Amino acid sequence: MAESEESSWLVIDGYEDEPAAFGVPPYVGFHIRYICGVLESKNLEYEYCPIDSFRINPPNLENRLGVIILAGAVVPGKYLRGTPISLKETREIISNTPNETPILCGGWAIRGWKNQGWSPLRHNLFLALKDTDATLSNYLETGEWRHNRRTAEQWTAWAQAGAKSKAVTDNPDLSGPLTYEVEVYQGCVRFKRGCKFCIEPKKGIPIWRDPEDIIKEVSIA
């Protein structure tokens, strides 16, 4: 995997697999694209690395502006083209990253591990419990970690910026059979008494994207 001579962010795609989101190859998830979209919109250097590529040829963790790990596989399953990141692998990446480098971990697996008692002690490590992309954006603007949710305007901007991000252009499956998943809304009408196996009700009242924004995102991709 190519290394940048300049300091850059490292985005590790640990994949997501939710009842309403497929992010395990050949799918490229929308949440990882939003994260890359934040970095794209701020013109920051970054490297995109799927966890399967990380296992084969780990990128250098030195000289990084920061490391972002998305771990969102919460549905048990068997996969044909990839394997989501494990808690053990997440721990190893964190321990191998220089102490002065900020680390942001997000995704529903991170929330699940935290609820099960995982509470790593490390300087400048943040476990995002809301939108990872919005949390990252706030950190880049203020230098402070805080749980944030994206606004409708941010959703549009980061979705469209993410459509042409390295999560797509540097994806190992770009030549085929990469499948680009699109998020049209989040949440569930049964947010008070939703299905116990599903996490969508936990996102609250449904929020819909504007159809024109979705069409533009797809046209960019």
Located regions from the model:
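Acidic, low-complexity intrinsically disordered segments
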Residues: 2-216
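Short Fe-S-cluster ligation motifs
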Residues: 217-221
